[in-house]
Amino acid sequence: MVGALFILGEGVLKKPVEIIVTTDYSSMIEAMRFGRIEVGYFGPFSYVLAKSKAPEIEPFGVGVEKGKPNYQSILIATADGPVKEIADIKGKPFAFGDRASTSSHLAPRAHLAKKGLIGDADYKVVHLGQHDAVARAVAAGQVPAGALSEAIYRVLVETKKVDPAKLRQLALSEPIPNYPMTVQGFLKPELKDAIKRAFLELKDPTILKLFRVEAIAAATDRDYDVLRDMAKVLNLDIAKL
């Protein structure tokens, strides 16, 4: 992806590009909030959090994968462990990733809430930070169940970083809108429009492959209301997160 951003920035926009890789979602939100980043590629829920703190941020693009601008979380359990179905999670630890992650926290936690399982009341919430850490911990039996991005899970299986024989698939979450591409609202209109066009009109399969998408479709803030609804299910006050 870094290479793709350089190509777009310096090749298409004719502008020098500085790539900033933040350590986690929270630091990226703060960098965007205080204007240290002009273009940001957020996780869906981290975008919602960022938008609540910096309303001027504008989503404009979303990656399309397998013909869809969305993805899902997968809830998994240790194959030979005590969790055979969702109901078995009650009274046990459950692993999530980053607190601001959509597919390894918000979506699966909302999914469990809709099944009558409330975090830290019906099961112990464990945060492991990264998607792959969740998969590895569950496969090793360190925690009996957990959740991560279904797409990342498939990559971990395909690259043999986790053994699917050691895992049981419990459920998939409802569809989640893909990661939004965002731009600072304070940029000059002509630059902002040029950035949006550079992404939305992108057809080069080589560059798209670097983004790990088939195409980039237009996105609006309203597309992410589903995340705000999930937060309501969990009684989360987005403004205070």
Language-model region placement:
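Extracytoplasmic small-molecule ligand-binding "clamshell" domains
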Residues: 1-46
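Acidic, polar ligand-binding/catalytic clefts
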Residues: 30-88
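Pocket-lining segment of extracytoplasmic ligand-binding domains
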Residues: 81, 90-190
